[in-house]
């Protein structure tokens, strides 16, 4: 992903404030509520019967933290996202059979959750930079599918 110096500063500046557990759990929870068909990949997580059940589910929160921790790793390797996410791409393609469109949807949920948590700090320019990053990560995760 090519980011200008200003975009990199916006991304890294905001990311330094992010609570990975809180934002990750909320972003994954939002994905499962807004796009309920994605729940089929998480049947082992127990009760996903309502928005409250999803958002309060400890397994959703734990996996959301794991997802955002991995995303954070990608922020350290913006010039090599495909390499950084190669193993995860293979896992999601070959073993889990996740529709790669879901990566884009989750990226959008991450952006929405960041906007929700950081409001005025997450202005249009910061959002534009994060949209580039989540698109790059989604593309890297979908790489094995091509």
Swiss-Prot record:
The gene is HBB. It comes from Ctenodactylus gundi. Keywords: Acetylation, Heme, Iron, Metal-binding, Oxygen transport, Phosphoprotein, S-nitrosylation, Transport. The modification Phosphothreonine is found at residue 12. Coiled coil: none annotated. GO terms for biological process: hydrogen peroxide catabolic process. GO terms for cellular component: blood microparticle; haptoglobin-hemoglobin complex; hemoglobin complex. The modification S-nitrosocysteine is found at residue 93. Red blood cells. It comes from the Eukaryota. The modification Phosphoserine is found at residue 44. Heme b binds at residues 63, 92. PANTHER family: HEMOGLOBIN FAMILY MEMBER, HEMOGLOBIN SUBUNIT BETA. Residues 2-146 form the Globin domain. The keyword Glycoprotein does not apply. Belongs to the globin family. GO terms for molecular function: haptoglobin binding; heme binding; hemoglobin alpha binding; metal ion binding; organic acid binding; oxygen binding; oxygen carrier activity; peroxidase activity. InterPro entries: Globin, Globin-like_sf, Globin/Proto, Hemoglobin_b, Hemoglobin_oxygen_transport. The keyword Iron applies. The modification N6-acetyllysine is found at residues 59, 82, 144. Heterotetramer of two alpha chains and two beta chains. Disulfide bonds: none annotated. The modification N-acetylvaline is found at residue 1. This is Hemoglobin subunit beta. Involved in oxygen transport from the lung to the various peripheral tissues.
């Amino acid at each position: 992903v090519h980011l200008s110096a200003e975009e990199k500063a916006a991304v890294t500046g905001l990311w330094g404030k992010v609570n990975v557990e809180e934002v990750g759990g909320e972003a994954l929870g939002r994905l499962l509520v807004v796009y309920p068909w994605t729940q089929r990949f998480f049947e082992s997580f127990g009760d996903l019967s309502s928005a409250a059940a999803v958002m309060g589910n400890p397994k959703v929160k734990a996996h959301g933290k794991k997802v955002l921790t991995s995303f954070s790793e990608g922020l350290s390797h913006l010039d090599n996202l495909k390499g950084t996410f190669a193993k995860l791409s293979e896992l999601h393609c070959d073993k889990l059979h996740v529709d790669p469109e879901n990566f884009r949807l989750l990226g959008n949920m991450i952006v929405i959750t960041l906007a929700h948590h950081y409001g005025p700090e997450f202005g249009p320019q910061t959002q534009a930079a994060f949209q580039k990053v989540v698109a790059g990560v989604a593309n890297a995760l979908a790489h094995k599918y091509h």
